[in-house]
């Protein structure tokens, strides 16, 4: 059986047992912000396990998972992977231990026809809870007791945490044959690789209390997990997932691209790293994640760059990973349409990151080589952080290269340097939001509220809870704090749009609302400043600021107009990568392989403003998610939408979708007609990161304000320049040309003064061992002038090496230039000077520059001669 057949057989088997087939959830956990990635099948079912969602009783999934704790091990072991698929069947207060065990055995031995002699199991032997006699007796119906092993808490007892749901588990092991330690006593407790756990069945039947006692749960659950990769290994009778059909197509194509056979150890590791990391990268990008230096984006960047470095070590000179995307699509695109639908986009993102990294690698490796030469046993964390911060050079690569050179990396001091840098930029709000989350999670089930802001801008509401500015729940509040209401017209910050502001009022007081946010999916939290006393349980009048809402709505609908215009002008490569919408400005981030031309940008804003002039209706409807494809709606890559979802159509009604200007799935607030936008103005456009660009603009009332401010500034400039508004650009260009000519004349005069020996300049000519040296101390010269002087002198002295320096406080800057007829290496001389004078230097054979501490000038010249 191939992997597709095995995956389908698992889902179909448990469907026949009454389980609902549930699609894989996103790799980005939607209901648990504490997780970086989805790493188990049960993550999407937390509410079902806790009894909060009773819509499902039995379920079966094939869940996409990413685990990144062992990235450095991938490629060097038979088992480690970063992306994997977890097959799982679940019960929420429905079937329990006997059925779970019987069905697992039936599936493995009858559906897959795995020989029973290949299978072993383990049960919980007892400890904090009693021995799992039930599981033991159920397994005895299928296996002799010699094949049932009893293990402790570490292997066979699952807990959610120090308290809460927990229970014993039973693991199923597959015997891969006598290829491990070959010890006659080898069994499932041996880590030689012969016995591999393929399925874990968790029996969640207890609740652990604060005092450590364990009591039965009222709802007993089943949570199982079986790695598809390991199961396919067993079915295809191979020793590693990299030998299964989940990887072999990618590895075979990688062999061609890397021009290696994969027969020696280093080549095998490279192929495994490349095939694993490209697979993970494709899935992550299909979820809307982009390479960055933080969070999930950093993991993605790390995977791409690690694969690239090993490709480079194999001899590759340029980007190659993006060429493997089509192989991943061929094998997984049918099962996971988010890959097939975004194949070109994924390839473009990876190629852009590859191009950026090859530049980074060249610069970073050169600097790292200098650091390695100066390091004895350990590379300092400060140096590693310098490479990371300045060149984007991953610390993991620094560590791997250092180890290959026999050096260690001081990871502790690296983390310290990184932490200090983060402390400088960390906002109090980021830390405070974590505190909010912890408090609200404890009481969220009693705080469900309703958003009515699409239909109303004011309403009567009941105060559910109030919290003070320290985020402590109180009965009454005066001054700053927070409130949750039973219903609210306040749009909470989300989807790139800033939250509403407005006010609460009641008989004896009022509260200004500065913003609303949504820390959990069912809670809108209002930040308030109370005059009087706001009481829990009280009835209040709630109203948003209508002008602020109108300005924000104009900017948000303008973003939709720009998005559609970009897609039409630039093409399919455009995908939304982020957005920010407030009352005063909008920002739109989009993917693009190249910068748009000025003509393209002009066309984009012309299209958007034509849509404004045509006074298109803007219609919003809640519709089934499946309508998105039917109607041609634009969706965000990787976004997990509710079903039903909110559709925003510009230019037509839903009965005539072919007439539309644009259609997106969006939960934000919008104008009713594009004429309310008035105009859309570009403020600036530029690169945000590799392959991602940003447009900043204004629309509506904010655009009018922007035009007023700029007209006022232009009028003031016209007055200063003594010209008309219309002639300001020409007059400014004329002034700039005059300034440029004056600067050029000043630079020429300065060079003449410097080379003429005035102003403290000292020029010296020496010949040592047949090598001609021209040295100069150019007081007051800037770095650009140093280079110009060196170039000028090298033309006059074609067989010399030129050294020019300038002192600035306690530091000396210098350049070294090798004239055409000289055989002295400028970079070697510069680094030698820096090394002897507590400095640093770099460059190439013909030109180098550096800095060092100030010493006596004659001592400096003496050092040059010693080095030559």
UniProtKB/Swiss-Prot annotation:
Its main location: cytoplasm. It is found in: Cytoplasm. It comes from the Bacteria. It catalyses: tRNA(Ala) + L-alanine + ATP = L-alanyl-tRNA(Ala) + AMP + diphosphate. Keywords: Aminoacyl-tRNA synthetase, ATP-binding, Cytoplasm, Ligase, Metal-binding, Nucleotide-binding, Protein biosynthesis, RNA-binding, tRNA-binding, Zinc. Binds 1 zinc ion per subunit. GO terms for molecular function: alanine-tRNA ligase activity; aminoacyl-tRNA deacylase activity; ATP binding; tRNA binding; zinc ion binding. GO terms for cellular component: cytosol. Its EC number is 6.1.1.7. GO terms for biological process: alanyl-tRNA aminoacylation. InterPro entries: aa-tRNA-synth_II/BPL/LPL, Ala-tRNA-lgiase_IIc, Ala-tRNA-ligase_IIc_anticod-bd, Ala-tRNA-synth_IIc_core, Ala-tRNA-synth_IIc_N, Ala-tRNA_ligase, Ala_tRNA_ligase_euk/bac, DHHA1_dom. Zn(2+) binds at residues 556, 560, 666, 670. Its cofactor is Zn(2+). Catalyzes the attachment of alanine to tRNA(Ala) in a two-step reaction: alanine is first activated by ATP to form Ala-AMP and then transferred to the acceptor end of tRNA(Ala). Also edits incorrectly charged Ser-tRNA(Ala) and Gly-tRNA(Ala) via its editing domain. Belongs to the class-II aminoacyl-tRNA synthetase family. Consists of three domains; the N-terminal catalytic domain, the editing domain and the C-terminal C-Ala domain. The editing domain removes incorrectly charged amino acids, while the C-Ala domain, along with tRNA(Ala), serves as a bridge to cooperatively bring together the editing and aminoacylation centers thus stimulating deacylation of misacylated tRNAs. This is Alanine--tRNA ligase. It comes from Elusimicrobium minutum (strain Pei191).
